[in-house]
């Protein structure tokens, strides 16, 4: 019979600290031409806001010049900005959606 060697398993525990993703605010900017109803529609369709939330954000945009639609990781924020800007152009509105670091 062969001699069985003693196999030693060494486990190395590597603790990696996962950093939360950087978050970005998606912002709608006021202009003098985009109808308020269109802004409310954008907030409901792209940001899943109910009618009251959408109206409140729209009024903030109207009175303060801009309003926060939501805070997301960069990839999601960037996608929403692109989608909203394309939708606004398709509907011939100058509404501008942008993002900034939260």
From Swiss-Prot:
Can you tell which superkingdom this protein's organism belongs to?
Bacteria
Q: Which SUPFAM superfamilies match?
A: ClpS-like
What the entry lists under InterPro entries is as follows: ClpS, ClpS_core, Ribosomal_bL12_C/ClpS-like
Please provide the Gene Ontology terms (biological process) for this protein. Answer: protein catabolic process; proteolysis
Q: How the protein assembles, per its UniProt entry?
A: Binds to the N-terminal domain of the chaperone ClpA.
Matching PANTHER family: ATP-DEPENDENT CLP PROTEASE ADAPTER PROTEIN CLPS, ATP-DEPENDENT CLP PROTEASE ADAPTER PROTEIN CLPS1, CHLOROPLASTIC
The entry sums up its family as follows: Belongs to the ClpS family.
Cited NCBIfam families: PRK00033.1-3 (NF000670), PRK00033.1-5 (NF000672)
Q: Could you tell me what this protein does?
A: Involved in the modulation of the specificity of the ClpAP-mediated ATP-dependent protein degradation.
Q: What is this protein called?
A: ATP-dependent Clp protease adapter protein ClpS
Top-level taxonomy: Bacteria, Pseudomonadati, Pseudomonadota, Gammaproteobacteria, Alteromonadales
Q: Which gene encodes it?
A: clpS
């Amino acid at each position: 019979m062969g001699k069985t060697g003693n196999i030693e398993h060494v486990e190395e525990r590597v603790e990696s600290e996962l950093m939360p993703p950087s978050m970005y605010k998606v912002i709608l900017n006021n202009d003098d031409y985009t109808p308020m109803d269109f802004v409310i529609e954008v907030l409901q369709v792209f940001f899943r806001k109910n009618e009251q939330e959408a109206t409140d954000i729209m009024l903030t945009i109207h009175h303060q010049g801009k309003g926060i639609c939501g805070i997301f990781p960069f990839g999601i924020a960037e996608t929403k900005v692109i989608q909203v800007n394309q939708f606004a152009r398709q509907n011939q509105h100058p509404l501008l959606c942008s993002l900034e670091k939260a």
